[in-house]
Amino acid sequence: MEKQFLKQRSDFEKSCVEREKKYHFPQGVIFETDIAYAKDKNKAHRLDRYRPKGKEAQILPVIINVHGGGLLLGNKEFNKYFCALLSKKGFLVYSMEYRLIPDCTFFDQLRDIFLAMDFVKEHAAADGGDLSHVYLVGDSGGACLATYANAIQNSKKIAKAAGVKPSGLKVHALGLISGMFYTTKFDKIGLFLPESHAVIDMLT
């Protein structure tokens, strides 16, 4: 099963190369890529930053984007055009990479979310971001992670049960697209989710 998932991941990465040829990056966006949000040199601990041109002097609301892919595949590049369009609407956007199952656990992925959030908390003001308006956006598996991360942020009980230290960054709203919310192990993705865990029990 693990080999099958790794093959799907490899096929996805190849499809992204072809996809890149079909789309043109929107004009009017300042784009910086592969910024490390942790000091461990893990290639998964990187993010991209998007800011609209012509608004360098303005303080902008902040979006942190968490890509989808069923927790097993995907990358920040897949949401490149989506994030650029969000930026053109007047947002400072950070699009983060995170470790993928089965190379890590679901709770490791949440730790990555909080590492990226701490990075944003530390750097957003210098990047022209408004920390009083921070939004967490995710699709599919990214929406699932964003939901659990937000629950942990707002409940010491859930954070303790998860064994995950939340970020000090306050999130003011979630933007969830086609969220993946599995609570059983009756599908191939669910095989890698905890069969029974206090955090899941609290939220289901």
Please state what every model-predicted region is.
Residues M1-T204:
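Alpha/beta-hydrolase superfamily serine-hydrolase fold, recognizing
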